[in-house]
A protein has these predicted regions:
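The C-terminal output helix
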Residues: 122-138
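Short hydrophobic/Thr-rich beta-strand motif most characteristic of the beta2 strand and flanking loop
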Residues: 31-40
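His-Asp phosphorelay/catalytic-motif detector in bacterial-type signaling
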Residues: 80-85
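C-terminal output helix
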Residues: 18, 112-121
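Conserved acidic segment of CheY-like receiver
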Residues: 3-24, 57
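Alpha4 helix (beta4-alpha4-beta5 surface) of REC/receiver domains from two-component response regulators
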Residues: 70, 88-107
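Acidic, metal-coordinating helix/loop segments flanking the phosphotransfer/catalytic sites
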Residues: 39-56
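Conserved phosphotransfer microenvironments
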Residues: 55-75
Length: 143
């Protein structure tokens, strides 16, 4: 199976490390290595996400200047939108409506259970790959 690339977005290096540990556990389940791209805010995350097209994006709600909600809106609203899974880690459960509004596929309230995060990411990445496999060859995006 091909390598999986995940973009981690947070101004906090410790938060990115925790995300990396949680997400890194999906390697065995997806049958291939996981590599990480990192951004410290939503603006940088949007640039990297649109340029690199990772398999998934995991963003901390407190992703400073342009936060996770803005990041998701920017990725979804771009001229060539990012269609992969976006997961937002929330500080408060009351912000779930913002995650939904922004176009996130999933959200978790801190503290995040790393197994739940990994399970959801695997589910979304496998679903995306199944859809791509079922798409006629002439309609597939070349990477």
């Amino acid at each position: 199976m091909p390598r999986v690339r995940v973009l981690l977005v947070s101004p906090d290096a410790n938060a990115r490390d925790l995300m990396r540990v949680s997400v890194g556990s999906i390697e065995r389940r997806l049958g291939g290595p996981v590599s990480f791209l990192e951004a410290v805010d939503g603006e940088q995350g949007a640039r990297i996400g649109l340029r690199e097209r990772p398999d998934a994006v995991v963003a901390d709600e407190i992703a400073s200047r342009a936060g996770a909600f803005s990041l998701a809106k920017d990725l979804r609203g771009a001229a060539d939108p990012y269609l992969g899974p976006i997961v937002i880690l929330l500080e408060r459960k009351h912000d779930a409506w913002l995650a939904r509004w922004s176009g996130a596929n999933a959200w978790f309230v801190r503290p995040v259970d790393p197994f739940e995060l990994a399970d959801r990411l695997v589910e979304m990445i496998e679903s995306d790959r199944d859809q791509l496999r079922n798409q006629p060859k002439d309609q597939r995006e070349t990477v």
